[in-house]
């Protein structure tokens, strides 16, 4: 137990500064890191599916997972009308995937399930994280890099502090389970604590940090961001628990010492990042 905790602390001590550094750099280095995380997460989803008798098209999915963040960054910085070509590219990729599944697998190889999991894996593990790109590289990011760095870190920090608050309140007060079948350690009191913690930290960070580096969030907007992040982060956590329960495993992989896999570490962020990007877009921030 002690050695596992030491590994977790050591990994966090290295990973957090690296993550902040990559976010500060932005650009292609940031897109490449997202592509790598997308491929690793996609691979873990495929491994979970394979435990249930579904054999995804690995290479096809990995290529798509790597391409999504790279194309998202290219499109963000391009003045061309990229949306229509992207739709054609997506349709072509789907058709190629289905053709490969049909000819390589045949009816006995469950081609429909293989294609469905192949598509889901890369969209879930890569496309959802790619919403960090429009946050980090918003309209005026070139002139205000520090402001956009803080904006990108904002939902991430809310998530981590909310998760810590949920754990602390759950341990302290206990009570009825939130999702006893999927995540037996989570309690309703912890869920409430995590939600309130997310709202409080969103307001505090928004007023004391974001609004001092160039943003102008109203208190009600910060409450909305904190509330939404406080809810969807817990939903994302439980969703990943569902995947693992279905596959009969404790962790999505053993890639990260003391932490499990990429899915285990980023589970909440798959829901938080697109939700935050949508709210920032709604508020006219990005």
Per-region residue spans from a language model:
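Interfacial loop-to-transmembrane junctions
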Residues: 245-268
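Juxtamembrane boundary at the C-terminal end of a transmembrane helix
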Residues: 278-286
């Amino acid at each position: 137990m002690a050695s596992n905790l030491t590994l977790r602390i050591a990994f966090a001590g290295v990973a957090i500064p690296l993550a902040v550094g990559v976010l500060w750099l932005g650009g292609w280095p940031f897109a490449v890191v997202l592509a790598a995380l997308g491929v690793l997460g996609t691979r873990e989803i495929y491994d979970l599916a394979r435990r249930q008798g579904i054999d995804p098209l690995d290479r096809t999915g990995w290529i798509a997972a790597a391409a999504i963040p790279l194309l998202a960054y290219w499109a963000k910085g391009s003045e061309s009308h990229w949306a229509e070509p992207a739709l054609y590219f997506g349709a072509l990729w789907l058709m190629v995937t289905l053709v490969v599944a049909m000819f390589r697998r045949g009816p006995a190889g469950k081609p429909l399930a293989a294609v469905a999991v192949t598509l889901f894996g890369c969209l879930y593990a890569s496309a959802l994280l790619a919403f960090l790109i429009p946050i980090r590289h918003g309209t005026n990011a070139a002139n205000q890099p520090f402001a956009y760095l803080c904006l990108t870190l904002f939902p991430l920090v809310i998530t981590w502090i909310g998760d810590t608050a949920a754990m602390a309140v759950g341990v302290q007060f206990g009570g009825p389970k939130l999702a006893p079948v999927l995540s037996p350690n989570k309690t309703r009191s912890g869920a409430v604590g995590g939600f309130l913690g997310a709202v409080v930290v969103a307001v505090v960070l928004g007023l004391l940090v974001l609004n001092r580096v160039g943003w102008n969030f109203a208190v009600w907007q910060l409450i909305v961001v904190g509330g939404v992040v406080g809810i969807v982060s817990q939903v994302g956590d439980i969703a990943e628990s569902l995947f693992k329960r279905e596959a009969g495993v404790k962790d999505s992989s053993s890639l990260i010492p003391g932490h499990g896999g990429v899915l285990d570490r980023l589970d909440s962020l798959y829901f938080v990042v697109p939700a935050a990007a949508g709210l920032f877009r709604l508020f006219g921030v990005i």
